[in-house]
Amino acid sequence: MNQSDKDIKGTTTVGLACKDGIVLATEKRATMGSLVANKGAEKLFKLDKKTGATIAGTVSHAQSLMDVLKAEISLYRLSNGKDMSIDALAVLCSNILKSGPFYVQTILGGIDKDGAKLYSLDPSGSYIKDECISTGSGSPYAYGVLEDRYNPEISVDEGKIIALKALSSAMERDVYSGNGYRLATITDDGMKIYSEDEISEVVKEF
């Protein structure tokens, strides 16, 4: 358990609920203790048309969890003829984590018929609905920016700048976070994952 705790803390992710959607952002460094094991780790996933997630923790567990969630979302649509709500997805993810062990902390975000929703889940399966979330070892530094700049009335265009600024603050102070950004926004038009060039343009707006 001690090793898993270290794995889960060794990253920084951010999720924001905005007036017109969701912003999800992560940095790209993967570590094994004091070793930088990967400088381009994928910690941001598209689960469905308007649903995404960030992960922190053991890589194999995180990938397995994301695969299971994608499959369950597709099965639900086939069986019920409609999309799974974000609330139901959070409960499903909680039940999967409880059946673990999955040494994973995740942020789930998306848009359903009731609007934009954001959840944080830990390895025990506990889940919390919130509007502004950061996870991982860099989260104290990220929250310093988020608490100063975030409010629920911001747009996703404003939110993506704030999210990357929060990650930048974490990357400056946390040795387990770094090597660039991943960024996605979710609106009524769907989930958009940003390219490196598009992210560079957002960073210029800091």
Regions found by a protein language model. Give the residues of each.
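Hydrophobic beta-strand positions in blades of beta-propellers and related beta-sheet-rich domains
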Residues: 22, 116-120, 183, 191
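Residues in well-ordered beta-strands of folded domains
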Residues: 45, 54-56, 107-109, 122, ...
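A mid-sequence, solvent-exposed acidic-amphipathic segment
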Residues: 103, 107-133
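Conserved phosphate-donor
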Residues: 104-116, 172-185
